[in-house]
UniProtKB/Swiss-Prot annotation:
Its main location: membrane. It is found in: Cell inner membrane. Gene3D superfamilies: 3.60.21.10. Its cofactor is Mn(2+). Binds 2 Mn(2+) ions per subunit in a binuclear metal center. Transmembrane segments: none annotated. Hydrolyzes the pyrophosphate bond of UDP-2,3-diacylglucosamine to yield 2,3-diacylglucosamine 1-phosphate (lipid X) and UMP by catalyzing the attack of water at the alpha-P atom. Involved in the biosynthesis of lipid A, a phosphorylated glycolipid that anchors the lipopolysaccharide to the outer membrane of the cell. This is UDP-2,3-diacylglucosamine hydrolase. Substrate binds at residues 79-80, 122, 160, 164, 167, 195. Pathway: Glycolipid biosynthesis; lipid IV(A) biosynthesis; lipid IV(A) from (3R)-3-hydroxytetradecanoyl-[acyl-carrier-protein] and UDP-N-acetyl-alpha-D-glucosamine: step 4/6. GO terms for molecular function: manganese ion binding; UDP-2,3-diacylglucosamine hydrolase activity. It comes from Salmonella paratyphi B (strain ATCC BAA-1250 / SPB7).
Amino acid sequence: MATLFIADLHLQTEEPAIVAGFLRFLAVEARQADALYILGDLFEAWIGDDDPNPLHREMAVAIKSLVDSGVPCFFIHGNRDFLIGKRFARESGMTLLPQEKVLDLYGRNVLIMHGDTLCTDDAGYQAFRAKVHNPWVQRLFLTLPLFIRRRIAARMRAGSKAANSSKSLDIMDVNAQTVVAEMEKHRVQWLIHGHTHRPAVHELSANDQPAFRVVLGAWHHEGSMVKVTPDNVELIAFPL
């Protein structure tokens, strides 16, 4: 009995070792789970469900195989793949979730999210996020030819990398008050998220009780998952 959480794989054809590691994860660890939750940034970039990138089809088939085996897969959008839509969800068998979701996991109420909305000290990013999450902006972008979308996405990634290089690490991490506010809004003592690439289990106080924030790591040289069982919540790093 276990529910698994992963995030920030940033899958791309230029990183075949990470792709292979994810395929092994789907075929082995995930097959033993009650459910798999992917908390955003499964892909390095997503410019629309109509992008014929072979990697996308390969991942859809692999995830669908997991779902068809009896393990449901749920997905929360990240800041890199927020344009994943109903078509890819249908092809992969994934269930799309809202950006914040409370789960009842073996008697624990657990809030899950990608985590970028917690980084409220980074005002520049939050302003950018508000723009690209505007439904009208997204609809307009998706009407553009694929080659133009690719150019825009590449330019945005380059701009993001340049901007982040000049920001302090503290600004790009979560805001502690925002974390507590979210946990108290949802009346939970557990929060699982990704985005910051800083795997850790943090103890804090929320709702006048001890609380825990579990941060998933990015998949670079190793994989990262959170395994929730009736008895434990465990952050696990594993070789790819």
